């Protein structure tokens, strides 16, 4: 079943099934555990009642409100479900999910895969009968996802690729008919951006050290990196569309010991490509 903006999956072939993710919370309500979208609970309840289906497990890919918002409504309709909610880093009253944990019902064996990066608690679920992967928000049916921790996210994408699943069931968008290709696209997209940014910083370092022009510096600010890669863009485009993701790349390159920086505001500080011999340093301006 695909309900509203977040895809909700009922998994299994018998009367007892697994539900993966719930609908988004009502945006007018501040608490993510208050009631979600009425249309979602009405549809899912009607489907379960009509087909005489019971839920054995409710699996949540991660904590974001558009995946957990329907939990209170499920419990309000059926209080027995309170003991059947599973999430990595569970909230009060929920059950934990661990990497490799198996959830089984008739026609479906689902294995939990820990895939942090988009969020700290993100899980994917492998449906062994189909060699398919419920990708959560790590890989979408359209466009690209965002990452809270880019380094861990890239590791998770590679872990997902190593599973060899052909089909992907994303939390948003259409079914991914060939998941290996989509994962490769995601990985190449991120790695390509890393290469572009490191190349821009390396060119600036070579220019600053080699030419020794008066006033030429070895590093670049975020805005200058954008200018070097994309040309001149409106400030609002940089601030809202590019800055968050590019800063993530810079932090990852710093953690990978490829880039250093001067202290200060991340948007205004200078970032430097480190020399090979100095890449054992995590931060700082190269001499």
From Swiss-Prot:
Q: Where does Zn(2+) 1 bind?
A: 62, 64
Q: Name one GO biological process term.
A: secondary metabolite biosynthetic process
**Record's SMART domains?**
Lactamase_B
GO MF term list: beta-lactamase activity; zinc ion binding
Cite the InterPro entries for this sequence. Beta-lactamase_class-B_CS, LACTB2-like_MBL-fold, Metallo-B-lactamas, RibonucZ/Hydroxyglut_hydro, Sec-metab_biosynth-thioest, WH-like_DNA-bd_sf
Active-site annotation: 66
Q: What is its EC number?
A: 3.1.-.-
User: Ribonucleoprotein: is it a keyword of this entry?
Assistant: no
Cofactor(s) the record lists: Zn(2+)
| PROSITE patterns per UniProt | BETA_LACTAMASE_B_1
Listed pathway(s)? Secondary metabolite biosynthesis
**Keyword Endoplasmic reticulum on this protein?**
no
Residues binding Zn(2+) 2, per UniProt: 66-67
Task: Tell me which family the UniProt entry assigns to this protein.
Answer: Belongs to the metallo-beta-lactamase superfamily.
Could you identify this protein by its name? Lactamase-like protein nscB
